[in-house]
A protein has these predicted regions:
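Class I S-adenosyl-L-methionine-dependent methyltransferase module
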Residues: 67-69, 73-192, 225, 229-271
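Conserved proline-anchored active-site loop of SAM-dependent methyltransferases
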Residues: 33, 47-61, 70-74, 214-231
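Conserved SAM/SAH-binding loop
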Residues: 202-207
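Glycine-rich phosphate-binding loop signature in dinucleotide/nucleotide-binding domains
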Residues: 40-43, 145, 211-215
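A short helix-to-beta-strand connector/capping loop
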Residues: 191-199
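General small-molecule cofactor/ligand-binding pocket signal
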Residues: 69, 199-201
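S-adenosyl-L-methionine
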Residues: 1-46, 50, 56-63, 87
């Protein structure tokens, strides 16, 4: 499919932070949350979002606070923080050219790959899954060849996550067993932030809080039994790109990054 070709980043249609689907997303509650915080507290120093998720609350805090600490155990969330809030300079023209290249891919000429073999015809339409796998491998190859710096790498991976989010044939963490509607990939870049005061972590929240300081701590842990690392296993797989062996109907890798906040240990974990 040849779609949405642009000459520059400024005039390109871009993904906004809130464009991604995510369980527990606070997009509709953010204004209310920040109003309460501002009415009950003073100062504009350091804001800590210890379970950042999509980082929608952290982004809102950036309008007031000089420093915002973001933390999440998921690789697919951490890479989005580096993409949106990283401070390393990046070449927008280079990424626009790559986005255009990805939008003109002919899936018929792309070989089967790890992504299409595992997720094609299940989570994603077969031809789309070949494109996704090709793009992911191309991003990795360019990074290893030093054609991308770490910020450009993060922006491309995050843009890929946002691009495929609405194409997924899923209900929760598994796929819907019915024919998949064919839709174009339509690769778009994200709208990066100009905020320079972000500090980004990927650590166990209970350990991290012992080593950081701030004025406001916003604590919004997982609150259901579904592990986020299992719910978003495709994105975790896509970002890490270790190409693990997958198991079960939902095609998940071996468990990792399991949160005690999603278990009967939640109460004791909070006390800690």
């Amino acid at each position: 499919y040849g779609l949405n070709l642009f000459n520059d980043y400024k005039n390109q249609d871009k993904f906004q932070l809130q464009s991604r689907r995510y369980i527990g997303n606070k997009a509709k509650l953010t204004d209310w949350i920040m109003e309460i915080i501002e009415s009950e507290t003073e100062g504009n120093g350091t804001f800590i979002d210890i379970f950042s998720g999509t980082s929608i609350v952290a982004k809102s805090a950036m309008e007031k606070y000089k420093t915002v600490i973001l933390n999440d155990i998921l690789y697919s969330n951490n890479i989005t923080y580096q993409a949106f809030y990283g401070t390393l300079k990046w070449n927008s023209n280079k990424l626009v050219e790559l986005a255009n290249e990805y939008n003109t891919l002919n899936s018929k000429s792309i070989r089967e790959n790890y992504f299409s073999k595992n997720f094609g015809g299940k989570f994603y339409e077969k031809e789309i899954s070949k494109q996704i796998g090709y793009i992911r491998q191309d991003i990795e190859k360019k990074k290893k060849n030093n054609e991308l710096n770490s910020r450009e790498y993060a922006i491309l991976l995050t843009s890929l996550i946002y691009t495929i989010d609405r194409l997924a044939n899923t209900v929760g963490h598994a796929y819907i067993k019915k024919p998949i509607t064919k839709r174009p990939l339509n690769f778009k870049l994200i709208q990066t932030s100009d905020f320079k005061g972000a500090k980004i972590y990927q650590e166990d929240a209970n350990e991290l809080v012992r080593n950081i300081k701030g004025d406001i701590a916003y604590i919004d842990p997982p609150y259901n039994s579904r592990q986020y690392s299992r719910f978003y296993h495709i994105y975790e797989n896509l970002v890490q790109w270790k190409k693990p062996k997958l198991f079960g109907v939902a095609l998940k890798p071996e468990p990792e990054n399991m949160s005690k906040y999603c278990t009967v240990q939640a109460k004791d974990t909070f006390k800690d």
